Amino acid sequence: MKIVRVALAVPLPRLFDYFVPDDVSLQIGMRVLVPFGTQKRVAIVADFPTKSDVPEDKLKAILQPLDLAPLFTPIYWDWLHWAANYYQAGLGDVLFQALPVKLRNGESAVKNDRTFWRITDAGKNALKQGELKRSKKQAEALQYLSETDLEKGNNDFSSAIWSALKAKGFIEEITIQTNPLSWQQRLGNNPIVNAENRLTLNKQQALAFSQLLFHSGFNVWLLDGVTGSGKTEIYLQYIEEILKSGKQVLVLVPEIGLTPQTVQRFKVRFNVEIDVLHSNLTDTQRLYVWDRARSGQSAIVIGTRSALFTQFSNLGAIILDEEHDSSYKQQDSWRYHARDLAIVLAQKLNISVLMGSATPSLESINNVQNGKYQHLVLSKRAGNSTALRHFVIDLKNQNIQNGLSKPLLERMKAHLEKGNQVLLFLNRRGFAPVLLCHECGWIAQCPHCEKPYTYHQHQNVLRCHHCGAQKTIPRQCGDCGSTHLVTTGLGTEQLEETLKTLFPHYSVARIDRDSTSRKGKLEGYLEDIQQGKSQILIGTQMLAKGHHFPNVTLVALVNVDSALFSLDFRAEERLAQLYIQVAGRAGRADKQGEVVLQTHYPDHPLLTTLLANGYQAFAKETLQLRHSMGLPPFTFQALIKAQARHSDLAENCLSQIADFFQSKQITGLQMLGPMPAPFSKKAGQYRWQLLLQHPSRMTLQKALREYQQAELEKNSQVRLILDVDPQDLS
């Protein structure tokens, strides 16, 4: 009896055995349909063991193979196994993550033909006669078809619209047999680039570019360039060289950095096949791009984090923009980091990774210092951008209106009256709220740890996340006796309403995840900003990077204090990165730019170092501090989270896990917790966490593997999450 071991997308970190009928031929990496309980499930062939732990008479047969050949090349298969091992994830979770949804659901991976919608003569007449005046969306779809055929399922119109038009006889389906051409065949004798759009590199850019070309094979390059220094031009010219060698390129950008203007810049420069992968695509569109990259039809794929799992027939380089950005870390399912996984993939493919940032992560700076990464520096702004002026406003004793001080309002008024735009930036992500005195700046601190208490709104208590101590909310300041105690944090909607009242003659645009959740909203806002229709811009992370706003001359960071006293040791690094990135939005043309920072703590070491000496000086000091405190990147961490409807269930579950690690007596292993998460209740679930830390990555991995294999008592009411190399401790 031939046995096959398969991976399934189920919440169980194990593989499952079936037997293979004699007339069926399988290979590792192919999909099969199997019985699983009372259901039929898609599975992926992972191994052919000689025997099974399941008795032969209990083994079920696979139902049918779904592929003629493996869906994964040997290198990608090896890479995905590495990812599953490192991130302590189920192989099924990882393999299925690497496939488009349509393939996860069992649809065919072979695309021999494509189906299109085409307008009929009746449809053309209907357009002329205006028969669809009452059906605006149908009229739009028909108008679109009058200009070009549209692939079925691979467009922006719903299936209901097409069904209605087909029922009326206005459109028809046509099927075209395809023999896909590679991107080089489609290019023919045309040039790869439009040379008139290629910019002349300055001395620093030319030096960096020549170093890139001099080295071949696997390398990790950190392009460390100040905002506006021309990193994108180096990307484009490097991509041109890769394409000239006949290879493909993957360009990764943060979720919020993938805008139409980013894609347009590539399409204006290159005459090759460019595909885009992002969260707004349909499942059909995602499968289409996956197939094109795998068959060599795509020359360039630009995408967000998950685009990393796109297989290429001949990948030549990976570009990773804004390498420091936290959105490269997956925060649900299995928690991989796209930057780190991209480097492992490049190593296995023997190609280079070019990573760029104006504010590199401290991990990457440390890897440069250790000789693991090559360092390319662009310290000068390209073009005619003028130097910025920086100002700090001390909020103590200021009259504040919803987070806005009088000096800031006066500066805003001055810039707006000159016809310029103003950007106010808020960031609350991952920053735990702390209690402070508005009069003198006193912070409520734990007397045992000398660290700020975290304010827990649901329980209305202060809790120390270093030792677990808690206390009731004080009525007055511990230093000056003032009763004016405030928590850090401010909402974009509150700020929007305040600004509309204070500046009634100017248009206010609020750009955050809520206001841009609908398709096309972000693009509309960005166009309004470019055209000057909005004068006051309120932004979150979305506006911090990548956008060119030539008329923005004043940028203000409204609330930074929570980052200065966060229990997350990375909060200060993120604040420094945000400050530099946000400042890069001001004065990008020939206009003088100003950056204003509001804080109760103008003398905080982070702010004084950052403003006086820049990001590199801050990074150097912070790395020294991390080293002395035994924090990453000099140690390695894993976070185990427990969520349950009852707090004691989550706490007890983590206590059992902590006891397990304690029993192993692992030298050098530090544990913090179990303790409530900084945001201890979310969506009706109580959240607890246990942080593990060790100076050896290998030792920590071994301990985690033993924990995964241990027969610990499970509680179905508790959801456990393991996050290796956590980026967010909240």
From Swiss-Prot:
Where in the numbering of this chain does the Helicase ATP-binding domain appear? 212-378
The UniProt entry's sequence similarity note says:
Belongs to the helicase family. PriA subfamily.
Binding residues annotated for Zn(2+) 1, in chain numbering: C437, C440, C477, C480
**What is this enzyme's catalytic activity, as reactions?**
Couples ATP hydrolysis with the unwinding of duplex DNA by translocating in the 3'-5' direction; ATP + H2O = ADP + phosphate + H(+)
State the span of motif (DEAH box).
321-324
- For whether the record's keyword set contains Chaperone, the answer is no
Species of the source: Haemophilus influenzae (strain ATCC 51907 / DSM 11121 / KW20 / Rd)
Taking every annotated instance into account, which residue ranges of this chain make up the domain Helicase C-terminal?
472-640
Question: What NCBIfam families does the entry give?
Answer: priA (TIGR00595), PRK05580.1-1 (NF004065), PRK05580.1-4 (NF004067)
Entry's EC annotation: 5.6.2.4
**PANTHER family referenced in this protein's UniProt entry, alphabetically:** PRIMOSOMAL PROTEIN N
- How is the subunit organization of this protein annotated in UniProt? Component of the replication restart primosome.
In UniProt terms, what function does this protein have? Initiates the restart of stalled replication forks, which reloads the replicative helicase on sites other than the origin of replication. Recognizes and binds to abandoned replication forks and remodels them to uncover a helicase loading site. Promotes assembly of the primosome at these replication forks.
Query: Which InterPro entries does UniProt cross-reference here?
Result: DEAD/DEAH_box_helicase_dom, Helicase_ATP-bd, Helicase_C-like, P-loop_NTPase, PriA, PriA_3primeBD, PriA_3primeBD_sf, PriA_C
Residues the record lists as binding Zn(2+) 2: C446, C449, C464, C467
Show the GO cellular component annotation of the record.
Answer: primosome complex
Q: Which GO terms describe its biological process?
A: DNA recombination; DNA replication; DNA replication initiation; DNA replication, synthesis of primer; double-strand break repair
> What is the name attached to this protein's record?
Replication restart protein PriA
SUPFAM superfamilies referenced in this protein's UniProt entry, alphabetically: P-loop containing nucleoside triphosphate hydrolases (SSF52540)
Keyword Methyltransferase applies: no
